[in-house]
Amino acid sequence: LGCETYASDYNPVATLILKCTLEYPQRYARGEELKEGPLRGDVSKNLLVQDVERWGNWVLEEARKEIGRFYPVDEDGSIPVGYIWARTIKCQNPACGAEIPLMTQFWLAKKGDKRVSLYPYVADGKVEFKIVGTGYEEMPKDFNPDKGTVHKAITRCPVCGSVIDGKSVSRLFREGKAGQRMIAVVLHNPKGKGKTYRVANEKDISVFREAERYLEEKRKKLFDEWGMDPVPDEPTPEGKG
């Protein structure tokens, strides 16, 4: 509208939104005439779009150089874009002791006609998983992905059926007796559409361990340069952290 506008905000996200709605439209609304090439003389797309695309690609390439090895491409060209983890505790039944993944539900995708979930099963006294649903093995008729191993703070062992109350679970966490487990990998195939999934394997765990080691190396290097820990360690009492 051409109005002289002033605004301020402490929140960086809100500040960016204000700049995008009040400043950038006036600054970048005009196009830029192309100086060379077959479209010489035509007006290019918005300057801001060009800048975002240019620097976005730069950030992507720099990230690939530094951490690309932690996202190894699968044989079909799919690239890992996410990992699904679960916190774990040991079954408190002395005759069992199985590792229980703490999950309130097993859905991986539940949108439109796409219904994909993890399916837990027991093999040699251990909880294993496979992918079932749209595009995968058929989902068993008697399986309900909405029901995980945890319901209303009560944990049920998939191996022996024993239950653990919420207070006992909290105590195990406080005592440092809880663990974690990588369950599945979320993948994107540049030639395909949408996300796909597979169960995590030993290679995925190995790559994660390598990333952990690299993080510690990077952390030490930055600590030496900055004189402070780059990983936030302030207590968060309201979040019980």
Report residues per predicted region.
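Charged, often flexible domain-edge or linker segments that flank or initiate folded functional domains
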Residues: 1-241
